[in-house]
Amino acid sequence: MNTALAQQIANEGGVEAWMIAQQHKSLLRFLTCGSVDDGKSTLIGRLLHDTRQIYEDQLSSLHNDSKRHGTQGEKLDLALLVDGLQAEREQGITIDVAYRYFSTEKRKFIIADTPGHEQYTRNMATGASTCELAILLIDARKGVLDQTRRHSFISTLLGIKHLVVAINKMDLVDYSEETFTRIRKDYLTFAEQLPGNLDIRFVPLSALEGDNVASQSESMPWYSGPTLLEVLETVEIQRVVDAQPMRFPVQYVNRPNLDFRGYAGTLASGRVEVGQRVKVLPSGVESNVARIVTFDGDHEEAFAGEAITLVLTDEIDISRGDLLLAADEALPAVQSASVDVVWMAEQPLSPGQSYDIKIAGKKTRARVDGIRYQVDINNLTQREVENLPLNGIGLVDLTFDEPLVLDRYQQNPVTGGLIFIDRLSNVTVGAGMVHEPVSQATAAPSEFSAFELELNALVRRHFSHWGARDLLGDK
């Protein structure tokens, strides 16, 4: 057993008491991102090593792997703790998103180590979608690069409000305060293009040597701020969904017998309590909450993030994908929306195409009306394009086959986040974040049906010699 873990269990008075203490610790999900070879995996390995989260057999295996695949000479190559795929180890890069768990006396952590290469943008977006904080690594020798800007943009696009700029490899610039100050100034200048409500912190460190990672560095007396671990342990995460109105997407209708009918799901935002008047959308039918059933019995109230089953006082028609909210809230269903899209397929996203989409348990079909622009994620400029390529990010106009109840993604990631599914292969080909739902009053009517637009796109793609015009060319 890990000696540090054994000591914690002994201090708590046994395994059961230790497990109870773990349940009451707060959990922080964060990701590491940066340019190639900035030391992301090494930093995670250092965090695991210095917080004594590595078992003896893992340490022994790490010694052997360092000799075979290591890049640090006689030293332990801590990056190998995270770079698990054979292809990653052979190339010395991170390809897939690697998740690791560790805990300290103050907090629990889930780390997502995301790829730095531009061709793996989709992997990074996947890792960032569940995180609350991003560690942006910058090589002290290179400063702020295009990939630093790209990762900052993707992180904020996916709703991350806390950025820790870790200026790594300070040992290779003689722990220069001037270098740290210059990079800090350069990043803050760039950050003026990002949303204004961000919490940005800077930590100079050396992941290889352990400076300012879990313990204060003696080599940088000019830095009096917290270590990286202290930042992670003390940062206050204010979840957006806690302050938002109630949203309960129905994932499953639970009917084990004739005497029970419940609606299971995870409360996406807000709170719900027994006796509360709720409304079902899109039908608009109202009822009262009779019971809130959980795995450990009935509760009087529930909060965002909790998996619950709601029992209503009335027998009404509710199915998977319906949304429950407070009865006094007016939330109109919309049939169009502008969506920030991260495209993940080899086949580009083009106007006129139709895809299945899934949002908060609801599955329907959407048509691409047009692409407003693609973002150059290296300098955040916008440019007009005919289609959105693999790993491209852009703002897209969608029309849905049926009215949907949507929130802006920055307000509610559950009811504002969607995925695109290819109708033939059933493969997820893209991720979308609702930028702005378009009400019926502002939506422009289309003179062409969904079938006509899809047929037009098919003809232009496969029979370009026919010279068919783009029916959406005027948009």
From Swiss-Prot:
Residues reported to bind GTP: 34-41, 113-117, 168-171
Protein name per UniProt: Sulfate adenylyltransferase subunit 1
A biological-process GO annotation: sulfate assimilation
Matches recorded under Pfam families: GTP-eEF1A_C, GTP_EFTU
Region feature (G5): 206-208
CDD domains recorded: CysN_ATPS (cd04166), CysN_NodQ_II (cd03695), CysN_NoDQ_III (cd04095)
Domain tr-type G span(s) in chain numbering: 25-239
Coiled coil: none
Subunit structure: Heterodimer composed of CysD, the smaller subunit, and CysN.
MF GO annotations: ATP binding; GTP binding; GTPase activity; sulfate adenylyltransferase (ATP) activity
Annotated spans, G1: 34-41
Family stated for the protein in its record: Belongs to the TRAFAC class translation factor GTPase superfamily. Classic translation factor GTPase family. CysN/NodQ subfamily.
InterPro entries cross-referenced by the UniProt entry: CysN_GTP-bd (IPR041757), CysN_II (IPR044138), CysN_NoDQ_III (IPR044139), G_TR_CS (IPR031157), GTP-eEF1A_C (IPR054696), P-loop_NTPase (IPR027417), Small_GTP-bd (IPR005225), SO4_adenylTrfase_lsu (IPR011779)
Keywords: ATP-binding, GTP-binding, Nucleotide-binding, Nucleotidyltransferase, Transferase
Organism: Escherichia coli (strain SE11)
